[in-house]
Structure formats: C-alpha cells, structure tokens
C-alpha cells in the first residue's frame, strides 16, 4: 500500500514538473523581429549634405554615427560589417533615432566619403548597421 502511494505520488510530481517546464512566461512562438535601419545622404550640393537615419524594424536602445569620413583614409574593407561596426563603435558619436543632420562644414568637393550608423540592443550590443558612400559636391574654398 505504501509502495503504491509512493508510485502514485511520484507520477503526480513528474506530471506537475512536465507541465511546469512546458509553461513559461516567455512566448517562444512569438516571431522575433530583427532590428533594421536605413541611412540616407541627400541634398549633396555646395559643400553640404543632409544625413538621415531611422529605425525600420525592431527595437534598439541607442546608436552611434560617423557623419562623414574620407573613404581613402579607411584602411579596411567597409563592406565587411564586423569591421565597419567596430570602426563606428570606436569613432562614432552617440545619437538617438530618428537622426537628421545637415552637414555644413568640413566637406571637400570631389572627395568620396562614407557615412555610417549602428544601433544597440538593451544589452549594449550592436545589432544593426547602415552606411552610404557618396561624393561631396561644391567649389573649393567655399
């Protein structure tokens, strides 16, 4: 009799453990949204440019931007995302999204530049990036 009750109790505890393990407060079936963003450089004229960036999907918690940097001065392949992210982390300025800034100083006409931005998740890890290369337009000394 005692053995039978012990087996029934053990079976009951086992079932409870299975139910508890399969139920959690996290909804694992919910689709995970990968953060994405864009960056656009426009209105390139007269030694100025307009840089804009916004979050397209997902959620981020801060960003860093390099507004413009001469492509000729970059010593790595900026098409490799890991290298570009590291470069922006080390040299970028903290910003918030959406981001808009009109560059009115420092551009040299005819120079190819890169603009890049990265965004961070809640843990402070870079989760998305965007960049654009472009050529400054204007007149020397303006």
What spans do the regions from the language model cover?
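Sec-dependent bacterial lipoprotein signal peptides
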Residues: 1-21
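Repeat-associated, polar segments at repeat-unit boundaries in modular proteins
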Residues: 119-121, 129-138
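Bacterial Sec-dependent N-terminal signal peptides
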Residues: 17-47, 133-141
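Conserved aromatic anchor
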Residues: 47-60
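Beta-strand-rich modules
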Residues: 104-127
């Amino acid at each position: 009799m005692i053995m039978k009750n012990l087996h029934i109790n053990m079976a009951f505890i086992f079932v409870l453990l299975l139910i508890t393990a399969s139920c959690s407060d996290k909804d694992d079936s919910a689709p995970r949204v990968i953060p994405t963003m864009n960056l656009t450089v426009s209105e390139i004229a007269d030694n100025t440019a307009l840089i804009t960036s916004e979050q397209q999907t997902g959620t981020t918690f801060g960003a860093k931007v390099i507004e413009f940097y001469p492509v000729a001065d970059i010593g790595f392949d900026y098409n490799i995302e890991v290298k570009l992210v590291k470069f922006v982390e080390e040299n970028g300025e903290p910003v918030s999204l959406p981001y808009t800034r009109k560059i009115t100083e420092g551009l040299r006409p005819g120079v190819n530049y890169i603009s890049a931005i990265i965004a961070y998740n809640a843990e402070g890890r870079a989760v998305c990036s965007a960049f654009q290369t472009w050529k400054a337009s204007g007149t020397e000394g303006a």
